[in-house]
Amino acid sequence: METRAPYVLIGTFVLAAILAVFGFIYWLNNTGGIGPRTNYHVQFQGPVPGLLVGAGVLFNGIRVGEVAQLGLAPDNPRFVNATISVASATPVRADTRVGLDFQGLTGVPVVTLEGGMIVAKSGEPLTLIAEAGAGQSMTQAARDALRRVDSVLEDNSGPLKDTIANFKTFSDGLARNTGKLDGILAGLEKMTGGGAPAQKITYDLRTPQNLGPAAKTLSASLAIPEPTAVAMLQTQRMLFAPVGDNPGFADFLWADSIPKLVQARLIDSFENYDIAHAPLRTSDLGQADYQLLIDIRRFRIATDGETRVEIGLSARIVDKNGKVVASRLVETSEKLDKVEPAAAVAAFDAAFARIAKELIGWTVLAV
């Protein structure tokens, strides 16, 4: 008898512990369990898929109770009556909104309560009416939406077929007239100023060839650096005086900026005069005995009075020590019968040929 006593005590302790654990779990599941509770009747006007006795009741997202009872309405089997038991401190009102929510990945249903301002009359049992479609899950909502779409498509199958046929006819017409459409679009781009920009046309200044026999050659080395000029002359565009709109020259470009072009053609002219004693560029190797410094004063088309091209240069010959040996102005003009790029370039060629011939003769005498 004495041997069995410890086993009885141990068994009693184990049973008590098991009961305590179950009681604790029940208390947790019922939000404290022993607190005062209030029951409310809830009526759902449709199915409540998955809702079970013991399911949670949430007020503004906070668990306040559970579903105590479920059943069908005796007067209308489509309705579902439920009894919820919530903590008495929960501010349930006569206009509190009731719904059904599905939580988690598995979609566990819970009863949801939200808001409410109207206080129910004392003594009257409070019945809450759930919102229409409160028990509708996302799957059911999607199924109903697809069913409605299918119904709409079925009712309008004829017009839809006609619309698709019209699209096909329109598409075939576009395919047959692709070339014409490209032309129309190109015309619209031109009309609206769009499309690719116009291609610029480059013009060169011709080097004079017939400079006569070299009666006198350069007796010392000569360099011709890039001429100086004001900013307006540092351009490849055709210049006009006075400045105006000349649409015929919108796409006109000299082969290089005016100072570099004048330098290159002057050196070419000296080479054509006497290749054996041709001048150097300042970037060439070695230091020349003299430099021919050019400042461009005019290189333009003048439209005041008789239309003409004008070239004006100031020239100075400087020795190694920076001393000016000789200087002079060289200016000329050429009548321009027609203000267009080809005629203008021909006039510049003629004027530059006179400038180059005069500079060469003056330079070989001064050096």
Curated annotation (Swiss-Prot):
Major subcellular location class: membrane
Transmembrane segments: 8-28
SUPFAM superfamilies xref list: XCC0632-like (SSF159594)
UniProt keyword annotations, A-Z: Membrane, Transmembrane, Transmembrane helix
A Gene Ontology term for the protein's cellular component: membrane
Topological category with respect to the lipid bilayer: Single-pass membrane protein
Protein name per the record: Uncharacterized protein bll6063
Organism of origin: Bradyrhizobium diazoefficiens (strain JCM 10833 / BCRC 13528 / IAM 13628 / NBRC 14792 / USDA 110)
